[in-house]
Design a protein with these regions (language model features):
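Gly/Ser/Thr-rich beta-alpha loop segments that engage phosphate groups in nucleotides
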Residues: 65, 71-73, 101-104, 131, ...
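C-terminal motif of bacterial Sec signal peptides marking the signal peptidase cleavage site
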Residues: 26-28
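Alpha-helical cap/lid subdomain in secreted, periplasmic
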Residues: 107-241
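Residue-level signal for mature regions of secreted extracellular proteins and peptides
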Residues: 22-23
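Serine-esterase "nucleophile elbow" of acetyl-processing enzymes
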Residues: 37-101, 111-120
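Bacterial signal peptide processing site
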Residues: 30-33
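Bacterial N-terminal signal peptides that target proteins for export
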Residues: 2-19
Length: 241
């Protein structure tokens, strides 16, 4: 397969919901409810145990609920579906789901060593930042955290793919929303990263691909996300062969 990254990046700031910044994407990754600590710990333990036992480079997905597979069986989560698609294309990779619902960029940074480095990762796919927005964390702090994650990856010779949580509607120039929207492409340019511009392309605003909360993708919705992301990752992973 091949992917037109330029074309993907060109599809920016469109959508049908006049909200600040991707509520259907960002809330989907939002902070867990009050009774969630035990669930979150369970998800974390399950995530770290979900390595696909195959050959090839170790690919760790570091993210929040969209990575963890909120509301879905473990085998239907995004990393697992990506692994299945890659395998069907004859591409071997040992995929690890290190997604934790409710995680912020600070959480991802604090657990990088045991979630990513300890897994002997060759490649880390970073999809974090949504919960920072919901919690009102300053965009500059988010950028610093993501930058530190990228630097940790580099210090450990781990290649990094940065996944953007792109707004679906226009944002006002100079606003906090615009500052958040600029974080990912700016970091990708600064560090020369592989940059995936929109995680929920083809799924956001599609009720038949979302769970009853209207936020989290169904198994079919995740499949759409996985097909797009797998297409993007294929040449990156093939380069390890």
């Amino acid at each position: 397969m091949s992917v037109d990254q330029t074309g993907m990046q060109g599809t920016r700031w469109t959508g049908i919901v006049p909200i600040l910044i991707s509520a259907a994407i960002l809330v989907a990754c939002g902070a867990p409810p009050a009774d969630a600590p035990a669930e979150r710990a369970s998800q974390s333990q399950e995530s770290m145990a979900s390595a696909i036992p195959v050959q090839g480079p170790v690919v760790v997905f570091l993210g929040d609920s969209l990575t963890a597979g909120f509301g879905l069986p473990a085998e239907d989560a995004l990393p697992e579906q990506v692994a299945s698609i890659l395998k069907s294309e004859g591409i071997e990779a040992r995929v690890i789901n290190a997604g934790v619902s409710g995680d912020t960029t600070a959480n991802g940074l604090s657990r990088f060593d045991w979630s990513v480095t300890a897994a002997d990762a060759d490649l880390v796919v970073v999809a974090l930042g949504a919960n920072d927005y919901l919690m009102g964390i300053d965009p500059e702090r988010v950028k610093q955290n993501l930058s530190a994650i990228v630097q940790k990856a580099r210090e450990n010779n781990i290649e990094c793919v940065l996944v953007d949580l792109q707004p679906r509607s226009a944002v006002e120039e100079g606003s906090r929303d615009a500052a958040f929207a600029a974080i990912y492409p700016e970091l990708a340019t600064q560090f020369g990263l592989k940059y995936y511009p929109s995680l929920m392309t083809g799924v956001a605003n599609q009720p038949d691909l979302l769970q009853t909360d209207g936020l989290h993708p169904t198994e079919k919705g995740v499949r759409v996300m996985a097909e797009n992301l797998a297409q993007f990752l294929e040449p990156i992973i093939e380069a390890y062969e």
